[in-house]
Every structure is written in C-alpha cells, then in structure tokens.
Amino acid sequence: MTRLIAALMAATLATAASAQDAVVGTWQTEVDDGAFAYVTMLSCGAAVCGTIINTYKADGAPYQSENIGRQIVIDMAPKGDGTYVGRVYRPSNGKTYVGKMQVNGNALRLQGCVAGGLLCASQNWARIQ
C-alpha cells in the first residue's frame, strides 16, 4: 500500500511538472501602451511565474523600462489541461488582475479579469525561446 501511495504521488508530481514545462520559456507580449516585452516563464514552486527580461517600443527599438525585472505573471497554477489560473500584473496601469492563461504549442493566451471573471481583457503571446 505504501508503494502504491508513493507511486501515485510521484505520478502527480510528474504530471504537474510536465504541465509547467509546456509554458516554461521566453514569450513576446502584444504591444500595450506603445511597447512590448519579452517575458521569461519559470516554475515557482508548484506554479509558473513570468518576469519581464527586455522591453521594446512598438517599432522594435529596445528601451530601458522601469519594469524590467518585474514579475507580471504571478503564481499561475496548472490545471492539467494546458490552462492555468493565478494573477497578472499590467505595467501600463499598475494593476493586478485575476489571471488565466492557456498554452497551445508556441502560442499563449493570457487574460486578466475583474468582477469575478465576468470582464476580461486578453493578449496572445508568441514563444520566442
């Protein structure tokens, strides 16, 4: 019985890790308020977090934003079907929202929601690494 429980726990951990692997990497955001960013997604405990590593003007020219190094995808917990729930920070207005995201290969759809998820804005990000 102990072996069965240990095997089930290992399988659960492996499933969570493989779900996180799908989103781990560097992603390019959509242009928001005249700029876009590269965000690196990494495991943070049992969840995934994303931090801005580079910022660019809409024309692609790099610029030094005060948001470089800021975590904007916060504690996104995998649901096991390619979807995640957690929080997202929007640098252009300084607000944190209930977040949802779904990864599909090299595409990621990220949503920030208010009013219990009734009103959401979304972005589609592209994997760059």
Residues of each region from the PLM?
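Acidic, Gly/Ser/Thr-rich repeat motifs that build Ca2+-stabilized beta-propeller blades
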Residues: 86, 107-108
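Sec-dependent signal peptide recognition
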Residues: 1-7
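Short, exposed beta-strand-loop hairpins at the edges of beta-sheets
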Residues: 98-101, 108-119
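N-terminal signal peptide c-region/cleavage motif recognized by signal peptidases
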Residues: 14-17
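Short, linear, compositionally biased motifs with a strong N-terminal bias
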Residues: 10-11
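Edge beta-strand at a domain terminus
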Residues: 115-129
